[in-house]
Amino acid sequence: MLAKANRITSADDYRFIVRRGAKVAGAHSVSYLRSTEAGADARFGFIVSKKVGSAVRRNLVRRRLKAACRELVDDGLTAVDLVVRALPSAAAADYPALRADVATAVSRNRRRGPALAPAATAAEGP
């Protein structure tokens, strides 16, 4: 389970990251990333719509995505906000495939380096 410090909980934060973040498409997900100030905790949010499947299937996909993000935190990932939107194909994907999608999104963000401006708080507005 992700710690509270590693979760995006505000709808405004979700909206801000999805609208202003760098978009990285994977086979089973689309990720939106924003760099944050150095030393800040990495935060994650998940969007799993009914197109993915039944409630049981959606929760399974969400738990797998959370576990993949937890591994990134354990590996020392900091200073990024990441929202992962699961595509319908995620319903049939196994854990390694979902983990690869998330890891690819983060690695592409790291290659871009400081080109992404640090995320402003949702209170600052769009």
Task: Please annotate each region the language model reported.
Residues 1-126:
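Positively charged, solvent-exposed patches that mediate nucleic-acid binding
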